[in-house]
């Protein structure tokens, strides 16, 4: 199907995946199967990023389930959690929790802090913002370009959740919808953002110390737990260096063309194209799985080029 004539198709059903918790059978000395070994429980340690005791979370298969588990441990509402970082309580956008969770990772949940309202004059076509979301309805600022319109407004910070644009509540919108809304704002006019910043951390020594020792408690496996919006989570091997570079390139293209960063979306796009032989097959595969995004053709060709480079060893 030519790229220009792509139609939306019903998303292909994902193939059945392994259970989150699996047991292994050990063989007896006489060749008779022994009793099943105790099921392995995947337990992760978590803290509130602004300071708290350490809690334990387990038995979840999606981001929303994980947030509910964390909220239950710390007796807060799941809607209070803006996003999570891995192995650091800092607002480090390179350490965001997405659809993959290392089996040794320590989770820090960043919760709602101060609300603020900011008026911005759109002097340029581009605001200099990169948007991402937490997978459960909260879009937030992942990057601010140096010297941009937003960079000049010092009250707007990386990590701020965008709650409203010009009075319109956007909770529940995906990152690409928020980016599109911001891009469509008229140049040389004022607009208003209602933001919620993450609760600020108290500088408590023991908290960072706990983060350093957490991996000893969790285990030594180097796999990752892949969280999915539908179906069970699965334990997978870490991606190869070549695959990781290709996914990062796709993520860079998402930022360039759409003003978003989403490593899980980039991974899904890579997986859709890795066994395709030409860009038209790739376009059909993306329409089946990600048709709602309506990616531009030029973007699709660039993504196909990034995937092809990896397949050809470049």
Curated annotation (Swiss-Prot):
It comes from the Eukaryota. Residues 117-197 form the PDZ domain. GO terms for molecular function: identical protein binding. Keywords: Cytoplasm. The keyword Cell division does not apply. It is found in: Cytoplasm. CDD domains: GH2_GIPC, PDZ_GIPC2. Residues 13-25 have a biased composition (Basic and acidic residues). GO terms for cellular component: cytoplasm. Residues 1-12 have a biased composition (Basic residues). PANTHER family: PDZ DOMAIN-CONTAINING PROTEIN GIPC2 (PTHR12259:SF3), RGS-GAIP INTERACTING PROTEIN GIPC (PTHR12259). This is PDZ domain-containing protein GIPC2. It comes from Rattus norvegicus (Rat). The lineage of its organism: Eukaryota, Metazoa, Chordata, Craniata, Vertebrata.
């Amino acid at each position: 199907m030519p790229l220009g004539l792509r139609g939306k198709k019903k998303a292909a059903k994902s193939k059945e995946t392994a259970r989150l918790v699996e047991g292994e059978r050990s063989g007896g000395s006489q060749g008779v199967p022994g009793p099943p070994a105790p099921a392995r429980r995947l337990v992760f340690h978590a803290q509130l990023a602004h300071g708290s005791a350490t809690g334990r979370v387990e038995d979840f298969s999606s981001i929303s389930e994980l947030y509910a588990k964390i909220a239950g441990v710390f007796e807060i509402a799941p809607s209070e959690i803006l996003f999570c970082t891995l192995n650091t309580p800092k607002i480090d956008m390179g350490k965001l929790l997405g659809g993959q969770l290392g089996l040794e990772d320590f989770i820090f949940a960043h919760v709602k802090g101060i609300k603020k309202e900011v008026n911005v004059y759109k002097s340029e076509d581009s605001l200099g913002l990169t948007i991402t979301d937490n997978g459960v309805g909260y879009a937030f600022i992942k990057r601010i370009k140096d010297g941009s319109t937003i960079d000049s407004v010092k009250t707007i910070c990386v990590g701020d959740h965008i709650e409203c644009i010009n009075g319109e509540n956007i909770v529940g919108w995906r990152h690409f919808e928020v980016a599109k809304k911001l891009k469509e704002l008229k140049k040389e006019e004022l607009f208003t953002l209602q933001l919620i910043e993450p609760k600020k951390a108290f500088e408590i020594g023991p908290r960072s110390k706990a983060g350093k020792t957490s991996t000893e408690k969790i285990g030594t496996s180097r796999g990752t737990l892949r969280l999915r919006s539908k179906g069970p989570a699965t334990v997978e091997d870490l991606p190869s260096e070549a695959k990781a570079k290709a996914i990062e390139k796709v993520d860079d293209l998402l930022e360039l063309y759409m003003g978003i960063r989403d490593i899980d979306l980039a991974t899904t796009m890579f997986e859709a194209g890795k066994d395709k032989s030409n860009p038209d097959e790739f376009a059909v595969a993306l329409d089946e799985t990600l048709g709602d995004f309506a990616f531009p053709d030029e973007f699709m060709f660039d993504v196909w080029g990034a995937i092809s480079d990896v397949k050809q060893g470049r």
